[in-house]
Amino acid sequence: MEAKGKVVGVIGNLVTIEMVGTVSMNEIVFIKTGGQSLKAEIIRIRDGEVDAQVFEMTRGIAVGDDVEFTDKLLTVELGPGLLSQVYDGLQNPLPELATKCGFFLERGLYLSALDRNKKWSFNATAKVGDFIVAGDFLGFVIEGTINHKIMVPFDRRDSYRIIEIVGDGDYTVDDRIAVIEDDAGGKHIITMSFHWPVKVPVTSYKKRLIPNETMVTQTRIIDTFFPVAKGGTFCIPGPFGAGKTVLQQVTSRNADVDIVIIAACGERAGEVVETLKEFPELTDPRTGKSLMERTCIICNTSSMPVAAREASVYTAITISEYYRQMGLDILLLADSTSRWAQAMREMSGRLEEIPGDEAFPAYLESVIASFYERAGVVVLNNGSVGSVTVGGSVSPAGGNFEEPVTQATLKVVGAFHGLTRERSDARKFPAINPLDSWSKYRGVVEYEATEYARAFLVKGNEVNQMMRVVGEDGVSIDDFVVYLKSELLDSCYLQQNSFDSVDAAVSFERQNYMFNILYKILQSDFKFENKLEARSFINDLRQNILDMNLAPFKQEKFNKLEINLKNLLRSKKLDF
């Protein structure tokens, strides 16, 4: 029986609907008010009533307004043309919305996610008579720098036989590409695009693998000490102004991945505008073209309705899974998951659910876990491998890592990059705290060597805390040298200048080379007459290595500085 309903209550963006018929959880409905149709999603079903969260401002909705039930879940449209686009959480292209509406978006206006008129040059790889299943490739088109595979829609559950496929040529996303036949003789038309529900993980692959290949970000502190694996998960919690957004932008520019998906979820409009302005101007170091050519941005600012924040996170992960099915490596950056959790808290309060810690819903952990679990490395039907790596920034109030969102995230991620106010105020960027952060993945340097270096950082911090109480004269010269060595490692290796053309991105080879130099220095037993001599010598080493960091690797300037460094160390009768 087709469902029918009317509005019987409105609280903020939560609308209660009295209905007759059959509905399903997460079904999309349209509320008719003032000549507009406002999209909403059913989030609770009770006897004769449903509660729906509205993705628009609810001003003007009145008791008695008609509600149209679609019998469909919230979906995204998948096909060529997603890259270099900027969407809102409901996959409306924002540049086209701006053309239609101006600076202030009208509610109830929904546009097609893909350009219906653009023609793509299709190259067929399958042929008539081939047997196929969901996720198999029929052909490809060139999308920017990516070989965009045209696939059998993921909702096809059986094996099919191709009975018709078009020849190479130019087609739109709505043109018929192939006709397939099921075992019962039913025929199905395939186009370049199809829809997929955002809250349902894509499972059209053979098997999942354990992430073990390092995703090189070219940021020294991450790749060496707190690495991230392709298909892994990581979180970047930190207070406001600690550098989360810049770190994510640097990662997206330099990471060893094919495509970057950015979900700007509930961030301040200023930060989102900064991202939208900067990304088209950034040069992709791999291709020399604009970084936007392999980027898709899903943005919902804090001024947009809270329900759309959740939609933006799920839209981003679904698009990531779609490109993963082509055998590509995808990096999804969600900024910030705290805003999404706050939206859940707001909706949970309106539903009058029993609250958990700090009034967040009791199911917060399971929802966050289900999002991060959609990351992973998979083997596709044809044997190729694709991955989705998920990195979420968390914005705990006051930098308090004990709050529920951070704690729920820490339980499910494989790496923790904790930014601290202390390091950002000291202008030590990236402001990742080397004492609190951790990773479960393998890095670019041997584990034993990095643990030895981390032990120096811990010991150096202990000496530093002691000196704050008793002063420099209150510690032995040996402890003082340990402190100086830890500061040397911090300033020369853990810190990095994101705005320098050389130091912004450090290759795998260079990281290994420079770490080995510092590792030997940490292991060396220096003999000094007094603390003044120790400080002077270590400062000379520091300046020399900092200059090396800014010099092109193994070129004339770098080689000269390396000779100077070796001469400095030999002056202490050390064999380098």
Swiss-Prot record:
InterPro entries, A to Z: ATP-synt_VA_C, ATP-synth_a_Xtn, ATP_synth_asu-like_sf, ATPase_a/bsu_AS, ATPase_F1/V1/A1_a/bsu_N, ATPase_F1/V1/A1_a/bsu_N_sf, ATPase_F1/V1/A1_a/bsu_nucl-bd, ATPase_F1/V1_b/a_C
BP GO terms, sorted: proton motive force-driven plasma membrane ATP synthesis
Protein keywords: ATP synthesis, ATP-binding, Hydrogen ion transport, Ion transport, Nucleotide-binding, Translocase, Transport
Reaction catalysed by this enzyme: ATP + H2O + 4 H(+)(in) = ADP + phosphate + 5 H(+)(out)
Gene Ontology molecular function, alphabetical: ATP binding; proton-transporting ATP synthase activity, rotational mechanism; proton-transporting ATPase activity, rotational mechanism
Source taxon at top rank: Bacteria
SUPFAM superfamilies named among the record's database cross-references: C-terminal domain of alpha and beta subunits of F1 ATP synthase, N-terminal domain of alpha and beta subunits of F1 ATP synthase, P-loop containing nucleoside triphosphate hydrolases
Protein residues bound to ATP: G238, P239, F240, G241, A242, G243, K244, T245
Family matches, as Pfam families: ATP-synt_ab, ATP-synt_ab_N, ATP-synt_ab_Xtn, ATP-synt_VA_C
EC number: 7.1.2.2
HAMAP family the UniProt entry points to: ATP_synth_A_arch (MF_00309)
Entry's family note: Belongs to the ATPase alpha/beta chains family.
Purpose of the protein: Produces ATP from ADP in the presence of a proton gradient across the membrane. The V-type alpha chain is a catalytic subunit.
NCBIfam families given in the database record: PRK04192.1
Protein name, entry field: V-type ATP synthase alpha chain
Gene transcribed to yield this protein: atpA
